[in-house]
């Protein structure tokens, strides 16, 4: 009798789980909406089993993903109640529930992840992975919890600029893995720009033959060295491009992780690389002169539509991003074809001429069941009827679009541009400038307070942008992305009332270790210097609050508060972005105190 009892106890320990009394600290990024804990833990054994009631194809993909995870789970063919982990599709609670929601229950009897969709189960599994604390014997200790979770925003994005510096297919996949861990669901892929064309277009092979490589090792050298392109076999050629098969492979890899890839094809500006290859599409008709397409030339529209047809065949995303930013409109003012177009269409200025192009591109995309997405400059000259605005020059563009009943993705540079320095610039690798800390990213609320509840509903999400002018290596790119992307992930997913900076920072420290252990190259948050120490203390000097006379005026965008800035005893932070530095442009500083 005693022997049988011992055997039974041994079976319980080696089978589904063992209940421990040690509590486990719960740290999840992004922070779930609701976490209820019970004292004790659950031990997940080696090669524990799981079941899933997902439909066949989706279920097979999900099972393969789960089995490849560090937990070592094995798909069970037995009844689900006998499995250590059960993944269960359930009916949504009501029509307003997010399809990405999930519930994760860990009890002394096992683990149940339930959700109304495969995406929800996937995100529940990501939470389970973050909770799992590996033991030395290959088992995993898990806290007893009941987590109910759903995203705040439907769009949770990361932008990757691969024009300034090309990234390999493997690098992109690696970032998709990290995005999945932190429940981000959109990769905005900046494939074309003046620094290089990165996508194979079969109708126009010259684009990648003549504009995907540069005779310099990095963007900075190229920018200073004449900004010319070269072929792949030219001496010192640097760059690359994605074949259509490469792009499809990445799209599929992302889809299996519930990530949508949105391609960006720049127009009408940022197109030097196209116009070097096809100068007849520019206003001058000469290579290396213009950055903007000639909107008066009908061949421009033929070219763009042909390109977009191939792009849409590769990318099934609802959105196609057309850029629309930073166009230099001077050439249009002097171009006979552009002026003829303006007269024929009754356009009053060149901003309306750009809007004409955006309107035509939107109709073309809509005719192919796609939606146009563009930077906030597409507001100028009149917004296309169904366009979605990506607000980067602050929030003003997003506010204007939301008030006009247009969908908006918020990505203001002040909070979302990860190419800025993240710590003391003297201790960091080169960046474009600025100073954007983890804490500042975390502080961002994508819904401006000035919007009404009805207007705020048009804010569909938020995105981190990584422009790559000064980021030449993949290691440097990851250093700029992580851990700030984790803060953006929590901004995008977690309701504001559930956010807590100190708790998040401790969680981020843990995740930095995870990222390092898995081959990423994040900024070491444990060594963060923080704000410039001198900026925290008032300086006493003989000129304190004395009268001051400016012989040369300071720039209106760098006032630092006005005339008293130089005598108020307050010093600026690491960069002018804190609005505490007074600046003088195109003139020497001449001041008398």
Question: What label would you give each PLM region?
Answer:
Residues 58, 166-168, 194-200, 268-274, ...:
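Flexible loop/turn segments at secondary-structure boundaries
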Residues 274, 280-385, 392-399:
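Active-site neighborhood of glycoside hydrolase catalytic domains
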Residues 19-155, 476, 491-523:
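Contiguous, structured surface segment used for ligand recognition
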Residues 1-25:
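Bacterial Sec-dependent N-terminal signal peptides
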Residues 534-593:
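Disordered, acidic Ser/Thr/Pro-rich linker "stalks" and the adjacent N-terminal cap
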Residues 95-319, 360, 364, 463-467:
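Feature activates predominantly on carbohydrate-active enzymes
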Residues 372-377, 382-387, 393-537:
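Flexible, acidic glycine-rich loops studded with aromatic residues
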């Amino acid at each position: 009798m005693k022997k049988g009892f011992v055997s039974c106890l041994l079976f319980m320990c080696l089978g589904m789980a063992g209940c421990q009394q040690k509590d486990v600290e719960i740290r999840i990024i992004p922070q779930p909406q609701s976490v209820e804990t019970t004292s004790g833990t659950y031990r997940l054994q080696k090669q524990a089993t799981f079941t899933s009631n997902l439909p066949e194809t989706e279920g097979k993909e999900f099972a393969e993903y789960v089995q490849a995870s560090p937990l070592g789970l094995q798909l069970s063919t037995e009844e689900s109640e006998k499995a250590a982990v059960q993944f269960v599709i359930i009916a949504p609670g009501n029509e307003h529930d997010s399809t990405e929601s999930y519930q994760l229950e860990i009890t002394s009897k096992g683990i149940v992840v339930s959700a109304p969709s495969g995406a929800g189960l996937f995100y529940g599994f990501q939470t389970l992975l973050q909770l799992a604390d590996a033991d030395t014997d290959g088992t995993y200790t898990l806290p007893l919890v009941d987590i109910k979770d759903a995203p705040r925003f439907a769009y949770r994005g990361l932008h990757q600029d691969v024009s300034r510096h090309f990234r390999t297919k493997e690098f992109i996949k690696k970032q998709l893995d990290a995005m999945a861990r932190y429940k981000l669901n959109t990769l905005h892929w900046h494939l074309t720009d003046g620094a290089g064309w990165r996508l194979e277009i079969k109708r126009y092979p010259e684009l990648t033959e003549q504009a995907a490589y540069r005779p310099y090792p990095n963007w900075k050298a190229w920018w200073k060295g004449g900004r010319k392109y070269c072929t792949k076999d030219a001496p010192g050629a640097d760059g690359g491009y994605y074949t259509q098969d490469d792009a499809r492979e990445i799209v599929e890899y992302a889809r299996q992780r519930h990530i949508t890839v949105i391609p960006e094809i720049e127009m009408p500006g940022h197109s030097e690389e196209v116009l070097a290859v096809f100068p007849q599409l520019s206003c001058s008709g000469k290579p290396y002169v213009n950055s903007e397409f000639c909107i008066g030339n009908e061949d421009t529209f033929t070219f763009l539509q042909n390109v977009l047809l191939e792009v849409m065949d590769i990318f099934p995303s609802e959105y196609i991003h057309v850029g629309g930013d930073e166009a230099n409109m001077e050439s249009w003012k002097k171009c006979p074809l552009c002026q003829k177009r303006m007269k024929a269409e009754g356009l009053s200025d060149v901003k309306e001429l750009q809007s004409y192009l955006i309107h035509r591109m939107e109709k073309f995309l809509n005719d192919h069941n796609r939606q146009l997405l563009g930077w906030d400059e597409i507001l100028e000259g009149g917004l296309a009827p169904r366009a979605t605005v990506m607000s980067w020059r602050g929030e003003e563009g997003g506010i204007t679009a939301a008030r006009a009943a247009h969908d908006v993705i918020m990505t203001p540079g002040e909070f979302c541009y990860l190419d800025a320095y993240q710590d003391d610039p003297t201790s960091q690798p080169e960046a474009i400038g600025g100073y954007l800390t983890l804490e500042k990213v975390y502080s961002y609320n994508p819904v401006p307070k000035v919007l009404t509840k009805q207007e705020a509903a048009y804010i569909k999400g938020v995105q981190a942008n990584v422009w790559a002018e000064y980021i030449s290596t993949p290691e440097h790119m990851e250093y700029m992305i992580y851990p700030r992307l984790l803060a953006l992930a929590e901004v995008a997913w977690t309701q504001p009332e559930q956010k807590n900076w100190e708790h998040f920072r401790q969680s981020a420290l843990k995740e930095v270790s995870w990222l390092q252990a898995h081959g990423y190259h994040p900024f070491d948050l444990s060594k963060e210097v923080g704000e410039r120490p001198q900026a925290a203390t008032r300086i006493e000097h003989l000129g304190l609050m004395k009268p001051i006379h400016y012989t040369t005026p300071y720039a209106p965008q760098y006032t630092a508060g006005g005339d008293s800035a130089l005598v108020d005893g307050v010093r600026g932070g690491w960069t002018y972005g804190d609005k505490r530095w007074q600046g003088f442009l195109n003139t020497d500083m001449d001041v008398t105190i």
